[in-house]
A protein has these predicted regions:
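A structural motif
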Residues: 1-185
Length: 185
């Protein structure tokens, strides 16, 4: 591996088998990066992390079952990564987290709202007070949010994030291309 701040490598390097969608990457409090991706056809979500900060990589390990897209990754106030994985069709949102920064992953639990179907993997970010915020879009086009009650503490219930609807695009659905929107004259 080249030294930090050094030049880029001259070519791409093989990083594993084919992925079913774009991967996601995040750093944790140990200084290591973790990459998450889904297998072809969404057969499962997998993660691969650096063995040591700025070093080589451990093997791919299963992160969750069937997945619509690579899990969303966010670091919490304690420096531990949290992963949010949505099943195809959006009926189940799973949540897993590192037990310690750079450490093993907790088996996790279901994280979604009963009876609410989501259209895409949510987004998550840490605020200035150390609370993690998760945002998701429902199949009705409504944005929902769930926030930690305090840094690294329990979660508050899901709530509406405003009353404006957005245009939901189901995960895995083809996006509208520019040539489909505009006809040449």
């Amino acid at each position: 591996m080249p030294p930090p701040g050094g030049p880029w490598t001259a070519s791409w390097h093989r990083f594993g088998t084919a992925a079913g969608a774009a991967p996601r990457v995040a750093g944790d409090g140990s200084g290591r990066l973790t990459v998450a991706a889904i297998g072809p056809s969404g057969v499962g979500a997998f993660a691969r992390r650096q063995a040591v900060p700025s070093g080589g990589w451990d093997a791919w390990v299963p992160l969750s079952g069937w997945s619509a897209a690579a899990p969303a990754l966010a670091v919490n106030a304690g420096g531990r990564l949290e992963a949010f994985t949505l099943t195809p069709g959006g009926a189940r949102l799973d949540h897993r987290w590192q037990i310690t920064p750079g450490g093993e992953t907790h088996p996790g639990a279901e994280f979604g709202e009963p009876g609410i179907r989501l259209v895409a993997t949510p987004a998550a970010a840490l605020d200035a007070t150390g609370r993690l915020h998760v945002f998701a879009v429902t199949d009705a086009g409504r944005v929902r949010t769930r926030v930690r009650a305090r840094p690294s503490g329990g979660w508050q219930p899901w709530t509406a994030f405003g009353d404006r609807a957005v245009a939901p695009l189901l995960s895995g659905s083809p996006a509208l291309r520019a040539e489909d929107r505009f006809s040449p004259r």
